[in-house]
Swiss-Prot record:
It comes from Chlamydia trachomatis serovar D (strain ATCC VR-885 / DSM 19411 / UW-3/Cx). With S4 and S12 plays an important role in translational accuracy. The keyword RNA-binding applies. This is Small ribosomal subunit protein uS5. One of its GO terms (molecular function) is rRNA binding. GO terms for biological process: translation. The keyword Ribonucleoprotein applies.
């Protein structure tokens, strides 16, 4: 389930709801519902973040999740020509994620959650496979970990102390 909100026009961040979960606690007077939401925020140019929040009302959970996502923004600088520079295999808890670069025109070949994250990051051509756990939070954390471990040619040259004349 994905909903789109553009509440902050000035910062050009787009907000998507990845997962909404309803929890029920049975009390003496009946059932008491609470909601949790996993929110993704990005500008499709390399900045993105995610937030998780709980509240007694769905709208409050979504708002709090969006605020948490804006506080958790990261920048991905190693996106060259709409794809990633190299293959990466990352795992977080039980979720394992494989990202492979693709030729221009391929598009995003991935599952729904990973596709949304890659779109919001600004990736145009990539092949991704989610292995292991289907837990949404672990998949999102694995995707962020994979995108942050990417390094472009210049970064590798700097680490190896290769001077380009």
């Amino acid at each position: 389930m994905t909903l789109s909100r553009n509440s902050h026009k000035e910062d050009q961040l787009e907000e998507k709801v990845l997962v909404v979960n309803r929890c029920c606690k049975v009390v003496k007077g009946g059932r008491k519902f609470s909601f949790s939401a996993l929110i993704l925020v990005g500008d499709r140019k390399g900045r993105l973040g995610f937030g998780f929040a709980k509240a007694n009302e769905l709208t409050d959970a979504i708002r709090k999740g969006g605020d948490a996502a804006r506080k958790n923004l990261v920048s991905i600088n190693s996106l060259e020509g709409g794809s990633i520079p190299h293959e990466v295999l990352v795992n977080h808890d039980g979720a394992e994620l494989l990202l492979k670069p693709a030729k221009p025109g391929t598009g995003i070949v991935a599952g729904s959650r990973i596709r949304l994250i890659l779109e919001m990051a600004g990736v145009k051509d990539i092949v991704a496979k989610s292995l292991g756990s289907n837990n949404p939070m672990n998949q999102v954390k694995a995707a962020f970990k994979a995108l942050l471990t990417l390094s472009c040619k210049d970064d590798i040259m700097k680490r190896r102390a290769v001077i380009n004349d």
